[in-house]
């Protein structure tokens, strides 16, 4: 998915019940969440004017907020209707959709009962991106946080600080992204995507209890099983990677993306078998446009 420049967007954004022209959608510089990363969000895709798995995304958005102690002033149904307004107002066909919940600018105290909870829903025009070329990874130096130190199933802005840093470092070193390990050294995920490995007709993927269990990840697992593939969720070590013939990552924006290689530092593992990933990609592309 390729996005156009933000300053070229002339759509309307839904903010706390109002449709606001994109160029007038602003927040105060003393907004609490801007200073303390106290916001949660979702990344969604609209295909042919319909957001894929909107209910699941909305339910997770609310759960993410509740995990941070935020009281969301809207129900699942109300948020879904707000999405529909954004899509209708902007005549959206294919787009990336970003709902965001954040604390207001009433106070900069770490906690304050008077802080407002706000919601916006924005659409960003997108175009399909070519997936002909696979991407190359290295093992990032930063590890995922211990699950009992942060709510890992909350899609919060704070969770992305390390991911952004890791991706920047990967790019600076000539890679496309970083493979991240958990606190025990097991394979976790990439910076913004979940990872799968392939051997024969079996998919292997890390257990999603130490990182966000992606909605695209869950969808791909369902598709794989429907296609007769076996899926094993396990603790995976770096030394196991050379036993696999294929590798790919999943995410809302990237959908299904082949991995060509992973640099382990002492050796580089390459993957030539993309048949299963391509099959899953094709089926996923069909389902999201139904």
UniProtKB/Swiss-Prot annotation:
Describe the family membership recorded for this protein in Swiss-Prot or TrEMBL: Belongs to the class-IV pyridoxal-phosphate-dependent aminotransferase family.
What are its GO biological-process terms? Answer: isoleucine biosynthetic process; L-leucine biosynthetic process; L-valine biosynthetic process
Q: Return the InterPro entries for the record.
A: Aminotrans_IV, Aminotrans_IV_CS, Aminotransferase-like, B_amino_transI, BCAT-like_C, BCAT-like_N, Class-IV_PLP-Dep_Aminotrnsfr
GO MF terms held by the record = L-isoleucine-2-oxoglutarate transaminase activity; L-leucine-2-oxoglutarate transaminase activity; L-valine-2-oxoglutarate transaminase activity
Q: What is this protein called?
A: Probable branched-chain-amino-acid aminotransferase
Q: Which Pfam families does the entry link to?
A: Aminotran_4
Q: What pathway is it annotated to?
A: Amino-acid biosynthesis; L-isoleucine biosynthesis; L-isoleucine from 2-oxobutanoate: step 4/4; Amino-acid biosynthesis; L-leucine biosynthesis; L-leucine from 3-methyl-2-oxobutanoate: step 4/4; Amino-acid biosynthesis; L-valine biosynthesis; L-valine from pyruvate: step 4/4
Q: Which UniProt keywords apply?
A: Amino-acid biosynthesis, Aminotransferase, Branched-chain amino acid biosynthesis, Pyridoxal phosphate, Transferase
Positions carrying N6-(pyridoxal phosphate)lysine = 155
The question of whether Coiled coil is a record keyword is answered with no
Its cofactor is: pyridoxal 5'-phosphate
Catalyzed reactions: L-leucine + 2-oxoglutarate = 4-methyl-2-oxopentanoate + L-glutamate; L-isoleucine + 2-oxoglutarate = (S)-3-methyl-2-oxopentanoate + L-glutamate; L-valine + 2-oxoglutarate = 3-methyl-2-oxobutanoate + L-glutamate
Q: Which SUPFAM superfamilies match?
A: D-aminoacid aminotransferase-like PLP-dependent enzymes
Q: What does this protein do?
A: Acts on leucine, isoleucine and valine.
* EC number, as in UniProt: 2.6.1.42
Q: Which gene encodes it?
A: ilvE
